[in-house]
């Protein structure tokens, strides 16, 4: 297929004229039958079906892409406006295309969708028989427990097997939460009590300055508050199996990941008298970041409204409009000017882990979307501690698992053991609406349907005043609002109505 950049005006004209002949300023190989068109170099919004290709000739019924330099004529049979497709889905000669300037012969990557295995296919008929026998006794037992029972069935004998099966069913039944139990209160107490023993500390990567990871109580607060940006965002990046033991590839990936700006590799000197800015490269820093003089110069040439000169290895930049304000703004712009790397990744280090001596990359800063698009990175194992970013890139179910894993790991690092079911409840409540919501007045607690429950949490007068203006009605269906008005709560025994059936009166 062929992909090319075109104007929205041309595509609109083509859409009204198909089938039509379209003359373009590049050579289209014969045999091309389809193409995608972009107008912003990054996203493709049109799909075209091409019936034939011919060299350009001056014909009257041909729509022209531009007035001169035309080389080929495509006979376009059909054109369709589509949902935007990222340029990252296309490859040219096996390589990723970062930006499309004119055109390219490319192929589009497609995901292989495999059929999901049915649950029964994974489980042997003998295990299913054990589960069925337990159901006859009135108990539901997990598959893993049924497998363990089956392994020991011959050792126990038939009589003991049935006794143990019944006993296990009773134990599982006893472990189930009671109907109408206040699970939220239990979860809050079970997480909060050991949480008081947590320390407020930050882990520092040895030998690397400015490489810290927040742990303990501050990290737990970040998780339940659903902070948009964690205090110390970081990523754990795994490479594909064929690359993770190759030292050269790993170091190359590290350098490509680190976001390098001009201020990281050069000194910036402002001359107020001459109204110029001198960029003085530091050879040691440039070698460390695998950047050469051309990379630096090309980055500075992207700045608009300036004159760039090179003298004795230094780069002199002068604004075309001479003013102190312009000079100051230009200085700040050049300092932050990116040269290479991925936005958001401030630092990256590689460490050898495990008996097999496989490299793992750790970063300061996070950009999950762009990191996953690096060819050498294994997208199935790479991880970030930024939960909101996970929700944006991978979806709400992945964010739910991330909340659970991060909270569990934070507690375990402090030597605290909290039943995973309490953490699962918190993760479910934070994500069940389809977006990550905080446990607080800006999230779950602030969006309750009950006016009194919202007012009891925080900003009492604001909630009561707003409810009065809007004419809201509180049906007293929850816990907090019933406590406020002095009624029994709708949990535990308060959720059950007792029905008394009297004895019939007997005649004396």
From Swiss-Prot:
A Pfam family annotated for this UniProt entry: RNA_pol_Rpb1_5
Any one annotated GO CC term: cytoplasm
Localization per record: Cytoplasm
The enzyme's E.C. designation: 2.7.7.6
Region of interest: Unknown: 1-123
Listed GO biological process terms: DNA-templated transcription
Matching SUPFAM superfamilies: beta and beta-prime subunits of DNA dependent RNA-polymerase
Keywords: Cytoplasm, DNA-binding, DNA-directed RNA polymerase, Nucleotidyltransferase, Transcription, Transferase
First-tier enzyme category under EC: transferase
Task performed by this protein: DNA-dependent RNA polymerase (RNAP) catalyzes the transcription of DNA into RNA using the four ribonucleoside triphosphates as substrates. Forms part of the jaw domain.
Family: Belongs to the RNA polymerase beta' chain family.
Record's subunit section: Part of the RNA polymerase complex.
NCBIfam families the record matches: RNA_pol_rpoA2
UniProt-recorded name of the protein: DNA-directed RNA polymerase subunit Rpo1C
Record organism: Thermoplasma volcanium (strain ATCC 51530 / DSM 4299 / JCM 9571 / NBRC 15438 / GSS1)
Gene it is expressed from: rpo1C
């Amino acid at each position: 297929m062929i992909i090319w950049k075109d104007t929205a005006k041309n595509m609109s004209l083509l859409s009204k004229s198909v089938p039509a002949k379209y003359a373009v300023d590049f050579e289209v190989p014969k045999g091309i039958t389809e193409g995608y068109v972009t107008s912003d170099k990054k996203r493709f919004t049109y799909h075209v079906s091409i019936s034939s290709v011919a060299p350009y000739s001056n014909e009257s019924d041909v729509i022209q892409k531009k007035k001169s330099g035309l080389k080929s004529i495509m006979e376009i049979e059909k054109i369709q406006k589509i949902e935007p497709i990222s340029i990252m889905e296309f490859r040219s000669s096996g390589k990723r295309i970062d930006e499309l300037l004119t055109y390219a012969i490319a192929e589009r990557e497609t995901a292989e969708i495999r059929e999901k295995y049915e649950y029964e296919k994974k489980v042997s008929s003998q295990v299913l028989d054990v589960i069925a026998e337990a159901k006859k006794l009135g108990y539901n037992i997990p598959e893993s427990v049924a497998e363990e029972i089956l392994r020991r069935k011959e050792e126990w004998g038939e009589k003991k097997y049935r006794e143990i099966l019944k006993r296990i069913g009773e134990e599982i039944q006893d472990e189930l939460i009671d109907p109408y139990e206040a699970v939220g209160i239990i979860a809050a107490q079970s997480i909060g009590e050991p949480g008081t023993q947590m320390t407020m500390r930050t882990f520092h990567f040895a030998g690397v300055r400015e490489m810290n990871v927040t742990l303990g109580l501050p990290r737990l607060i970040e998780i339940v508050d659903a902070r948009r940006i964690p205090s110390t965002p970081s990523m754990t990046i795994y490479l594909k199996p064929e690359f993770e033991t190759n030292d050269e590839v790993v170091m190359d990936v590290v350098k490509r990941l680190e976001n390098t700006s001009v201020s990281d590799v050069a000194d910036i000197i402002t001359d107020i008298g001459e109204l110029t800015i001198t960029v003085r490269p530091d050879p040691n820093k440039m070698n460390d970041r695998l950047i050469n003089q051309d990379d630096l110069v090309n980055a500075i040439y992207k700045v608009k409204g300036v004159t760039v000169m090179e003298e004795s290895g230094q780069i002199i930049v002068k604004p075309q409009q001479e003013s102190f304000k312009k000079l100051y703004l230009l200085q700040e712009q050049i300092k932050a000017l990116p040269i290479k790397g991925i936005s958001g990744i401030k630092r990256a280090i590689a460490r050898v882990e495990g008996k097999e001596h496989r490299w793992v990359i750790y970063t300061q800063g996070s950009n999950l979307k762009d990191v996953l698009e690096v060819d050498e990175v294994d997208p199935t194992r790479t991880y970030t501690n930024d939960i909101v970013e996970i929700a944006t890139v991978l979806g709400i179910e992945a964010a739910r698992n991330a909340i659970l894993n991060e909270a569990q790991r934070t507690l375990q690092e402090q030597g605290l053991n909290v039943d995973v079911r309490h953490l699962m409840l918190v993760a479910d409540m934070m994500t069940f609406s389809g977006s990550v919501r905080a446990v607080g007045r800006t999230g779950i607690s602030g969006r309750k349907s009950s006016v009194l429950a919202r007012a009891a949490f925080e900003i009492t007068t604001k909630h009561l005043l707003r409810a009065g203006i809007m004419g809201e009605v509180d049906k007293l269906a929850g816990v907090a609002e019933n406590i406020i008005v002095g009624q029994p709560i709708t949990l535990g025994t308060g959720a059950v109505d007792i029905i008394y059936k009297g004895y019939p009166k007997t005649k004396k």
